[in-house]
Amino acid sequence: MGAQLRVYKRRIRSVTATKKITKAMEMIAASRVVKAQRKVAASTPYARELTRAVTAVGTGSNTKHPLTTEADSPSRAAVLLLTSDRGLAGAFNSNSIKAAEQLTERLEREGRQVDTYIVGRRGLAHYNFRERKVVESFAGFTDEPTYADAKKVAAPLIEAIEKDTAEGGVDELHIVYTEFVSMMTQTAVDSRLLPLSLDEVAEESGAKDEILPLYDFEPSAEDVLDALLPRYVESRIYNALLQSAASKHAATRRAMKSATDNAGELINTLSRLANAARQAEITQEISEIVGGASALADANAGSDN
């Protein structure tokens, strides 16, 4: 019985130490998600207005450009998947990967060859384990992405969209990331970045019936779109990176809170078992003492007779 009590005490100490770690990780994630939320709020208006500017230019000109012109028969698409470098975030990475795989299957059914680009070690590990081809990968900055990181990710994608498909280019650019809705809700979504669907953009921004201004372009609308293309792709990827970072921190906070709560419940259960074992040990000792005293009394009574 004493050995069993020692086992319970050892497990209580172990779970208590784990609880301290998960509580600390929960608090760290909570502080990081607040910072990430602020960055998302700061970057979203810029991305929205830049998209609106591209829409205005595309609507006001008849120029054929990768930003606004769809291929007659698209044959190749690039998919950018955003995951995290670290785990301990519940279903955060698996949901994004699942959404990317569903998008890839749909594009392939429609006759497109898919080139996959991945941000985050978790997504890369998933694809490498299954021996799936990855054109390019990026890692090391998913917790706190910067605009420079977004530019690094965007560079090969912009190069691919500007190339002809016969030279290894793509007709479409899609992105899969986790949208931050609230502290309790994060949703894996896929979005087509290029070519830009002018009607969808107007509907999303609530400007469907808005009359966009007419512009005179110097030197030309094509040159303006050439200048806007990298800015547009970089800003959208940067916003998606920030959304994914905020979602990852929120998922980590939720997972660590659940782990902390479970550790507390396990400690309570082990404490009850330890108390029961201690009580049983005390009861057994009392029974042995009483039994010994009774036997001694009987022996003394026999000797007196």
From Swiss-Prot:
Q: Which GO terms describe its molecular function?
A: ATP binding; proton-transporting ATP synthase activity, rotational mechanism
Coiled coil region boundaries: none
In terms of Gene3D superfamilies, this protein maps to: 3.40.1380.10, ATP synthase, gamma subunit, helix hairpin domain
| Chief site of localization | membrane
Q: Which InterPro entries match?
A: ATP_synth_F1_ATPase_gsu, ATP_synth_F1_gsu, ATP_synth_F1_gsu_CS
User: What's a GO cellular component annotated to this UniProt protein?
Assistant: proton-transporting ATP synthase complex
Identification of the protein by name? ATP synthase gamma chain
